[in-house]
A protein has these predicted regions:
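Short, conserved catalytic or interaction motifs in soluble domains
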Residues: 612
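A contiguous pocket-lining binding segment that forms or flanks enzyme active sites
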Residues: 615, 622
Length: 727
C-alpha cells in the first residue's frame, strides 16, 4: 500500500475509534477470536508463526542462537510444566510477579503496579482466559504502542530450562498470566532480549497509554509527597530506583538491603501518627518478591509499636513478600529517581478521571522536509512540526501554591526496542515551547523563532524513548516544537499533552492554496521575434509536440551554466502539454508556447533566487520558500510527498524537477477547482470521473480505494487529493 494511502486510511480508522482500548488493532493482523475458533474446530493447539518457539524469539546477541545463555532452553506449554495450570489464581496480585534470568525488572515493576487496579489490569489482561474452558493454547493481551492500542496474540509455549520457566514466573508455581504477558510484550518488541534494560515508566505507559514524568529525589520539590498521594488517588502508577555509578554496581545490595540499578514499584503513600508526630510513609515493592529494606519502618521494626492499632491495621507491613514501608524522609535519601505515570481519562473509571485533559498528535521528522533539528540549526529549525495549545483556566488547587496552568508534555520516539537488533540508536530528542502571538494557526517562521527565546522546554535533549516535563505557565497560547538535536535525522514520534483544565490543541500548519495568475493573451500580443523563433522550431504544423518540447527545453536549459539539470523527462513534458493545451491537439500552439515560455522564465528566476549557496540545485528546505513564491501555499504533509517524489539522494532538486513539480501542482489545483464548483474545499468523484478525467486515473483510483472504503463515490479534500496524486 502507498504510504500516503496508509496514512489516510489510518486517519479514517482513528475517526471511527480504531486503536482505542475498546477497538484495539490486531497486531500482525492476527485476530484472536478467529484463530482460537479455528484451533477449536480442528482440535489443535495454536502455534504462532509470527513469534515461533525458536532461538530468534529469545534474542539476537546475549540470547542469540549460539549464546551459552540459551543452551538447554526448551519451549513448553504450562500443561507440560504442571498438572493443573491456572491463568490467574485468586486474582492478580503484585506478589505474582517474580523476576527470572532476564534484565527486565523495569517491566516487572510496572506489571506489579498494574495489579493495584483491577479495572486497569483488565484493559491489558482481558478476562475470560483459562487453561480449562475452550483451551486452545492461545492467549491475548492488549498493549499501548505509540498512540494506539494493539491486541497481541500469542501461543502458550514458554522458554524453560530444567522444567522451570526461564524468565518471569509467579511465586504460585501453577499461575501463568505474568509469564504470558511478558511473552506478549516480547513479541511486540521483537524478542525477549529486546526487553533488557529500561525504565519503569516505559512499562507504565505501554500498559496504560499514560504519560510519565521523572523526579530526581536529590532535588525533590517540597510538595512531592502530596503529589505522590494525589497521583496514587488518581490511579497513577509509580516506580523508583537507585542510580549506579558503574556496571559493577548493577543489582548490588546495600547494607540496608536495597538493590541498586533495580526497578521498584511504589504502591502507597500514607501518613500515620507516631509518638504524637505525623510521619509520612511510602510503601515499595521489589519485583524479586524478596530482599527488603531493613531500616526504620521495615517489617517488624520497632517503629510499628509507636502507632495506634487502628492505624496499624490499615497498613500491611509484615511477611517476606518483597514489599515494605519506609519513611518518606528515608525514601528521598536512599532512592535516586521517582517515576510517575499519569493516566488518560479513558483509563480511569472514577469521576476523578476528568482531572486530566488529554491531547495526542503523531508526526514525523522527514529528512529534507521536517527534520529541522534544534534551534542550533537556524536554517532548518522552523521546518520542524509545530503544535499550538491554548491555556485559558488556571488550576483550582495548585500543589505548589503558585497560580497558573499545569501542563505535562511528553515527546516519544517510536520503535527503539525493535531497532536494537539492527544496531540502530535512538535519536537525541527534545522540545521547545514558544509564546504564540496569534497568526491564524500558520507555522511560525524564522522571523519569529530566531528572534524570540523559548519560554519553556525539555531540560535537555536526550537519547531516550521519551522526554517529558511538567510546567506551570500563565494562561495564553503556546507553540510546542518537537525536534531531534541534530538536523536531517529521520524519525517518527508521538507528542502528548496533559493539562489540568480543558485546553484546545491542534497542529500548526499552512493552509493549502494556490495563487497562480492566469495569462490572457492573443496571437497579436506575441512579439514578432518570438513568432519567428517559434515557427522555426515548430515546423510545418506550427505546433510543438511532446518530443519537440523535450528537445527545446533541454537545449535551452543546457546553456544555463548556473543551474543543474539532467534533462526534462517525457513525463514532465506531457504534464506541460496537458496543462496548457487548450484545443485538445496534444500539442502547443504559438500562444500556448508563449505562456509556457513566460512560466519557464519566472521559474528560473525563482530557482536562482532560492539557490542560496549557488550550487545549481535547490535544497529541500530552500524548496519550501521557492514553492511559496511561485504561488503555492503547501503544508508539511504535501511538502514531504514532494521531496520524496522530486529530490535526489542528497535531498537536492535540480531545475527540471523544480519545473516538473510546479507544473504538476498547477495542473492538480486546476483539476480540483474544476470539480469543486461550490468552492467547498471538497470534491465528489465517481469511479468514471476518477478513471477518465484524472491523470493516471487507474492508479489514482487504486490509491483512493486503499485509503477509503470502496464505494461508487469518493469524497476527497484538497490535502488528500494532492498527497495521493503526487505520491
Amino acid at each position: 500500500m502507498s504510504n500516503i494511502a496508509k496514512v489516510l486510511s489510518r486517519r479514517q480508522d482513528r475517526g471511527e475509534g480504531v486503536g482505542t482500548n475498546e477497538k484495539a488493532i490486531p497486531f500482525n493482523k492476527q485476530d484472536y477470536q478467529t484463530l482460537k475458533q479455528e484451533c477449536l474446530v480442528k482440535k489443535t493447539l495454536f502455534c504462532d508463526p509470527t513469534f515461533p518457539a525458536e532461538s530468534d524469539s529469545l534474542g539476537y546477541n546475549e540470547l542469540g542462537r549460539y549464546s551459552f545463555k540459551t543452551r538447554g532452553v526448551q519451549w513448553k506449554r504450562p500443561k507440560e510444566l504442571c498438572s493443573n495450570p491456572e491463568f490467574i489464581v485468586d486474582g492478580a496480585k503484585r506478589t505474582d510477579i517474580c523476576q527470572g534470568a532476564l534484565g527486565d525488572c523495569w517491566l516487572l515493576a510496572a506489571i506489579a503496579s498494574l495489579t493495584l487496579d483491577n479495572a486497569i489490569l483488565e484493559r491489558v489482561v482481558p478476562p475470560g482466559q483459562s487453561f480449562i474452558e475452550d483451551y486452545a493454547g492461545i492467549f491475548h493481551f492488549q498493549l499501548w504502542q505509540f498512540g494506539e492500542w494493539v491486541d497481541v496474540v500469542i501461543d502458550d509455549r514458554l522458554p524453560t530450562r530444567d522444567g522451570k520457566l526461564l524468565f518471569v514466573h509467579s511465586a504460585e508455581g501453577s499461575e501463568f498470566w505474568s509469564a504470558l504477558l511478558e511473552k506478549a510484550y516480547a513479541k511486540l518488541n521483537g524478542s525477549y532480549e529486546a526487553l533488557t534494560g529500561g525504565s519503569t515508566t516505559e512499562g507504565f505507559e505501554d500498559f496504560t497509554g499514560g504519560i510519565a514524568e521523572n523526579y530526581e529525589l536529590s532535588k525533590a520539590p517540597p510538595y512531592l509527597f502530596k503529589l505522590m498521594q494525589k497521583a496514587l488517588t488518581l490511579g497513577s502508577l509509580l516506580g523508583c530506583s537507585i542510580d549506579i555509578t558503574s556496571s559493577y554496581e548493577s543489582e548490588a545490595v546495600t547494607s540496608l538491603k536495597l538493590v541498586k540499578g533495580h526497578a521498584y514499584s511504589v504502591t502507597s503513600a500514607e501518613e500515620v501518627h507516631s509518638y504524637g508526630h505525623l510521619v509520612q510513609l511510602v510503601r515499595i515493592r521489589n519485583p524479586w518478591g524478596q530482599v527488603e529494606w531493613t531500616g526504620p519502618w521495615s517489617d517488624n521494626s520497632k517503629e510499628w509499636n509507636s502507632i495506634q492499632p487502628e492505624e496499624k491495621a490499615k497498613l500491611v507491613y509484615s511477611g517476606e513478600d518483597g514489599e515494605f514501608w519506609m519513611a518518606y524522609s528515608d525514601f528521598i535519601q536512599q532512592f535516586s529517581k521517582l517515576e510517575i505515570c499519569n493516566l488518560t481519562p479513558d483509563t480511569l473509571s472514577s469521576e476523578d478521571a476528568s482531572h486530566w485533559n488529554y491531547n495526542q498528535f503523531e508526526g514525523n521528522w522527514r529528512v529534507g522536509s521536517t527534520a529541522g533539528g534544534c534551534r542550533n540549526n537556524p536554517a532548518t529549525f522552523c521546518s520542524n512540526p509545530q503544535y499550538v495549545i491554548k491555556l485559558e483556566e488556571e488550576d483550582d488547587d495548585p500543589l505548589d501554591g503558585e497560580d497558573g496552568c499545569t501542563i505535562l508534555v511528553g515527546l516519544m520516539q517510536k520503535d527503539g526496542r525493535k531497532d536494537k537488533r539492527f544496531g540502530r540508536d535512538l535519536n537525541t530528542i527534545g522540545f521547545a515551547i514558544y509564546k504564540f502571538m496569534g497568526r491564524n494557526n500558520i507555522n511560525l517562521g524564522p522571523d519569529v523563532l530566531l528572534r524570540q527565546r523559548s519560554i519553556a522546554g525539555s531540560n535537555t535533549f536526550i537519547n531516550l524513548r521519551e522526554v517529558s516535563e511538567r510546567f506551570k505557565l500563565p494562561p495564553g497560547e503556546y507553540v510546542i516544537i518537537p525536534s531531534t538535536f541534530e538536523s536531517h535525522r529521520k524519525g517518527s514520534f508521538v507528542l502528548r499533552v496533559f493539562t489540568e483544565k480543558e485546553a484546545a490543541a491542534s497542529p500548526m500548519d499552512t493552509e493549502i492554496s494556490a495563487d497562480v495568475k492566469k495569462q490572457y493573451i492573443s496571437e497579436s500580443d506575441v512579439d514578432p521575434h518570438f513568432k519567428h523563433l517559434f515557427n522555426q522550431t515548430a515546423g510545418n504544423d506550427s505546433e510543438v509536440s511532446v518530443f519537440e518540447l523535450q528537445q527545446i527545453l533541454d537545449s535551452v536549459t543546457s546553456k544555463q551554466t548556473d543551474v543543474k539539470t539532467d534533462g526534462f523527462s517525457m513525463e514532465t513534458c506531457r504534464h506541460i502539454i496537458s496543462l496548457l493545451d487548450k484545443d485538445g491537439s496534444s500539442k502547443l500552439g504559438l500562444v500556448e508556447f508563449h505562456i509556457l515560455w513566460k512560466k519557464i522564465q519566472k521559474y528560473l528566476e525563482v530557482f536562482k533566487k532560492h539557490d542560496t549557496d549557488n550550487s545549481g540545485t535547490m535544497s529541500s528546505h530552500e524548496m519550501r520558500d521557492a514553492v511559496k513564491e511561485a504561488g503555492f501555499q503547501l503544508n508539511n504533509e504535501v511538502l514531504e510527498v514532494i521531496i520524496s517524489r522530486y529530490a535526489n539522494q542528497q535531498y537536492a532538486i535540480d531545475f527540471d524537477c523544480f519545473v516538473g513539480c510546479l507544473i504538476r501542482l498547477e495542473m492538480l489545483f486546476k483539476i480540483f477547482k474544476t470539480f469543486d464548483k461550490k468552492n467547498t474545499g471538497k470534491i465528489e468523484l465517481d469511479i468514471l470521473q476518477v478513471t477518465h478525467k484524472c491523470e493516471c486515473g487507474l492508479r489514482f483510483l487504486y490509491l483512493l480505494n486503499l485509503a477509503f472504503s470502496f464505494t461508487n463515490v469518493f469524497f476527497v479534500c484538497v490535502l488528500q487529493w494532492l498527497c495521493l496524486a503526487l505520491s
